[in-house]
Amino acid sequence: TLGDESFPRLILGDSYTDMTLENIAKGKPMGVYGMEEEGDMFIGITLNNIMVSFNVFVSGVLTSLMSVFLLFRNGIMVGCFDTFFYQHGILGESLLATMLHGTLELSAIIVAGAAGLAIGNGWLFPGTYSRLVSFQRGAKRGMKIVVGTVPIFIMAGFIEAFITRHTELNNFIRLGIILVSLAFVVYYFIYLPYKRNYHLENANRKTKD
């Protein structure tokens, strides 16, 4: 994007790019988040993100590479979006706004992609199991993971619809919400699974003893 100013149009589309340029000219670069009624926006965004996550997950059936490709494509879109605002000198404002909901949203999409990898790896690398049994185990494990992302998308959708639009909020408040969201992501996706597995391993050891 830095070397080709037409690249954002290729990735984000002409209409979105033109609308954003108009908002920047008006001094409201994040104006897109206030264009829709909060309730409708909450429902639409939440359902869309859940569908995206399930698409990334189910794509693992077509081998892990498809999940990786979809994650890569989404990464290009996010990178293009941020670089576009960097070119106009408002990257800081962009990050403070988008990461309010993006911290939860992007983390959940990545986790859904990992669930897709679990399906693909079960199909490609069955190990000592038959390919079908390995696939079923991977699908079951992956489904538990992706279902666990639904509450995260609901929270992210709420923040995007009701809070992100308020760019007049103090920057420290917005940064605080981002940091709390990040802490929750670490707790929900890293600490809780680790704690659960730790207790299961201890229980198994006691059973063997």
Describe every region a protein language model picked out.
Residues 1-26, 72-73:
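Interfacial/capping segments of alpha-helical transmembrane domains
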Residues 171-185:
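Small-residue-rich transmembrane alpha-helices that serve as helix-helix interface/gating elements
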Residues 34-66:
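Individual transmembrane alpha-helix segments
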Residues 82-168, 178-180:
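Hydrophobic alpha-helical transmembrane segments and adjacent short intramembrane/lumenal linkers
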Residues 21, 25-35, 39-44, 95-104:
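Short aromatic-rich membrane-water interface segments that cap or initiate transmembrane helices
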Residues 199-209:
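Short, highly charged, low-complexity non-transmembrane loops/tails of multi-pass membrane proteins
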Residues 60, 67-87:
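Small-polar-interrupted transmembrane alpha-helices in polytopic inner-membrane proteins
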Residues 184-192:
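Alpha-helical transmembrane segments
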